[in-house]
Amino acid sequence: MTKGILGRKIGMTQLFSDNGELIPVTVIQAEPNVVLQKKTLENDGYEALQIGFADKKESRTNKAEKGHAEKAGTAPKRYVREIRGAEVNSFEVGQEIKVDIFESGEKIDVTGTSKGKGFQGVIKRHGQQRGPTTHGSHFHRAPGAMGVIDPMRVFKGKKLPGHMGSEQVTIQNLEVVSVDTDKNLLLIKGNVPGAKKSYVKITSAVKGN
């Protein structure tokens, strides 16, 4: 069964284990999520739980969002995602999901939106090596050859300069170091995608513990 919760990235700090090892952790604030809808095989063709996190201002909410949230008896949410593989029958619409569904030592996958870097060249974007800087070289940070003459075109997927970051990224098999049920916090070993205050989705590890 897949478990999942939505949260907000607060930042990073560090903890010390019982044997004195320093552990870098990311703090995720996961206030109680609300089940907005249950997707079923009969009605939707697949099973999933639709959950919401963080109340949305009424002035920024449209009629459809208000009606959808009212069915669950809650306020419209800013961040709404689906958790596939969840035990749908174990939940009811309007039910709250809290951080206590996870425990220390559990392996999880974290999905977020990476930091936007704007338009970047091939060295920063793809990690390519730069050219010589002296001896008459005119090639320093350019992308290099586009390909051979014969096709008369540039193949799709050619690594070139362009927009970098601001895309969905999932990091797998991260470890839950600690769960604070009083403050609704999850402490996750290592870093997770996104800037501070960005939203993330935390699910059970696909590749298992």
Curated annotation (Swiss-Prot):
Keywords: Ribonucleoprotein, Ribosomal protein, RNA-binding, rRNA-binding. This is Large ribosomal subunit protein uL3. GO terms for molecular function: rRNA binding; structural constituent of ribosome. GO terms for cellular component: cytosolic large ribosomal subunit. InterPro entries: Ribosomal_uL3, Ribosomal_uL3_bac/org-type, Ribosomal_uL3_CS, Transl_B-barrel_sf. Belongs to the universal ribosomal protein uL3 family. One of its GO terms (biological process) is translation. One of the primary rRNA binding proteins, it binds directly near the 3'-end of the 23S rRNA, where it nucleates assembly of the 50S subunit. Part of the 50S ribosomal subunit. Forms a cluster with proteins L14 and L19.
